[in-house]
Amino acid sequence: MLFGRKNKLGDSYETPIFGTTESGSSIPKEELGKDSIAPNVAYRLIKDELMNEGNARLNLCTFCQTYMEDEATKLMAETLEKNAIDKSEYPQTTEMENRCVNMIANLWHAPEDMNYIGTSTVGSSEACMLGGMAMKFRWRNRAKKLGMDVTSKKPNLVVSSGYQVCWEKFCVYWDIEMRLVPMDEEHMSLNIDKVLDYVDDYTIGVVALQGITYTGKFDDIKALDALLEEYNKTAKISVPIHVDGASGGLFTPFIDPDMEWDFRLKNVVSISTSGHKYGLVYPGIGWVIWKDEEYLPKELIFEVSYLGGTM
């Protein structure tokens, strides 16, 4: 077939990507483009833009696993269209989530005589937020029953200065006073001797860090539990512990199973963690577990009929 000016053809799907008209155009940055782009061209342009980023497989410093088996990746790709929060439409996905909650609660030694409760989250930051909110609501409910004026001053949260930024966000979002126990060269984790200097009747809880980003240390949660146990004997309102196990919550049970940092301790009422701090798991999920239903105020649990479940 002969071609000339009058029957000149444009790009086709077989046209080499860098021979297409679109490949010579800039990717839109402020508004949608006027013309569509072939999917193979769009894929190549975006992939090339990502070439300037770091290589995730060489990342040894931000607690992110960078490899999963091909079958796991395939399963993820095959379920991308599912909105997992729709419990009635995807009941088996919900069942798998429940199994994970059971397994994690078991790893953290949830007492058999209590009714633990937990959920998945989009990451450990959301898990921390939920754990913090539960402490705030529970403190407020108990304080009101004791006749305390819950509006006279801000409630406060105690944590070491090695905290992860999500706790600062939590305190800003929910109007909580953040009380920081300083770390120094002699105390590269929570200084147990100083904790009670920051605790009072308006303390919603103490956050213990099972893995500090800056130092790699664990707070001495067993010692903290003993300290608060004595304090709570005479306190007007008891102070619980939430363990932020984002960094260590899913590997401590394996590397040091005898370490007492979890629900074996009386005053540890909730624990949060990050799923991707566990080996061979991509980023994208977090978990929070409460030792017993009493530590998760009922007003934070929602019955949603159109999504077919409890949130």
At which residue positions do the language-model features occur?
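N-terminal entrance/gating region of PLP-dependent enzymes' catalytic architecture
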Residues: 1-115
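Conserved beta-loop-alpha segment that forms the PLP phosphate-binding cup at the N-terminus of a helix
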Residues: 94-97, 101-102, 116-150, 166-168
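PLP-dependent aminotransferase-class I/II
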Residues: 122-125, 144-145, 150-226, 260
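Short acidic, glycine/serine/threonine-rich loops at helix termini
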Residues: 130-133, 168-173, 217-220, 251-256, ...
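Active-site-proximal loop/turn and secondary-structure-junction residues that shape catalytic pockets
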Residues: 163, 212, 245-249, 277
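Catalytic PLP-binding core of fold-type I/II PLP enzymes
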Residues: 218-256
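Active-site C-terminal subdomain of aminotransferase-like
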Residues: 254-257, 263-311
